[in-house]
């Protein structure tokens, strides 16, 4: 290991972990060395072994018993597993990037609040729906007050593995909270739809924000376009489906004006096909966060 490289372990060997592995292997700042799972037959562990990583199906206990520990951990297991392991990572001095909805540490959306949370020993990537929609809410709320925001994330059923399905309740709670605390809405709501359509549908998200009746719609639209460009820096397949739509106050919208934004996320196809943009935006955001933290770790060594 050179002084310029930060070592990492991936905890979890499912869809998200395997997609993340391919992104970390391309990183100039992070060296993925370990992948840890609990199923010796998992496809993720097989692929990681084939790519030269050290693997184990004996979980976090095995990793923390090694003579050399990673500088960073990326965990994509489930919320309850990460909650149990997080104090052990902290005790060992290992920085953690949490891709579960456990929310042990502060939630991070790279183009919105990454800089404010760089010193946290454990950062949370919220959810795929959160990464795709919270930046849009933030883009609106930096222009006008947003008393209410609602997001609907629709993802292909085949892209949702057992970990995602086990986390559905946490998904809605964590994403709703992120819409408020990071997106800036006074009240937030999140809905996820697992779409069983064949052939599989690309990830699509709808964002509704209540806005003042006299809001500057041009300024809001410009802010949304700037935020989309920021996201595209690390998720090239993120795009608006059409221009933001503005509606006058109505009974349906609770007497408030609203803006509706429709986006889709096409994945890079690193592990799963491009329709699995819900995985891609999580792993791309986690890689972005990890590289910034790795820069911190490297600077501290000098």
UniProtKB/Swiss-Prot annotation:
NAD(+) binds at residues 13-16, 159-167, 278. Coiled coil: none annotated. Its EC number is 1.2.1.10. It is an enzyme of class 1 (oxidoreductase). It holds the Pfam family AcetDehyd-dimer. It comes from the Bacteria. GO terms for molecular function: acetaldehyde dehydrogenase (acetylating) activity; NAD binding. This is Acetaldehyde dehydrogenase 1. It comes from Nocardia farcinica (strain IFM 10152). The lineage of its organism: Bacteria, Bacillati, Actinomycetota, Actinomycetes, Mycobacteriales.
């Amino acid at each position: 290991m050179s002084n310029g490289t930060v070592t990492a372990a991936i905890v979890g060997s499912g869809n998200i972990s395997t997609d993340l592995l391919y992104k970390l292997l391309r990183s100039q700042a992070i060296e993925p060395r370990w992948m840890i799972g609990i199923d010796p037959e998992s496809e993720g562990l097989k692929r990681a072994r084939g790519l030269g990583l050290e693997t184990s199906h004996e979980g976090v206990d095995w990793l923390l018993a090694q003579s050399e520990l990673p500088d960073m951990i990326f965990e994509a297991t489930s919320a309850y597993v990460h909650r149990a392991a997080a104090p052990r990572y902290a005790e060992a001095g290992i920085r953690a990037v949490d891709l579960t909805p456990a929310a042990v540490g502060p939630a991070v959306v790279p183009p919105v609040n990454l800089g404010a949370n760089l010193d946290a020993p454990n950062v949370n990537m919220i959810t795929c729906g959160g990464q795709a929609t919270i930046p849009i809410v933030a883009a609106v709320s930096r222009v006008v007050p947003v008393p209410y925001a609602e997001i609907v994330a629709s993802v292909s059923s085949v892209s949702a593995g057992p970990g995602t399905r086990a986390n559905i309740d946490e998904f809605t709670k964590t994403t709703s909270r992120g819409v408020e605390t990071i997106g800036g809405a006074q009240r937030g709501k999140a809905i996820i739809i697992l779409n069983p359509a064949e052939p599989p549908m690309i990830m699509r998200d709808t964002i509704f924000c209540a806005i003042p009746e006299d809001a500057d719609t041009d300024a809001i639209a410009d802010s949304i376009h700037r935020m989309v460009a920021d996201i595209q820096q690390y998720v090239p397949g993120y795009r608006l489906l059409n221009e933001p739509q503005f509606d006058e106050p109505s009974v349906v919208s609770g007497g408030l004006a609203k803006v509706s934004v429709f986006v889709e996320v096409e994945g890079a196809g690193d592990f799963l096909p491009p329709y699995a943009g819900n995985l891609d935006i999580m792993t791309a955001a986690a890689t972005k966060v990890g590289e910034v933290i790795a820069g911190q770790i490297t600077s501290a060594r000098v």
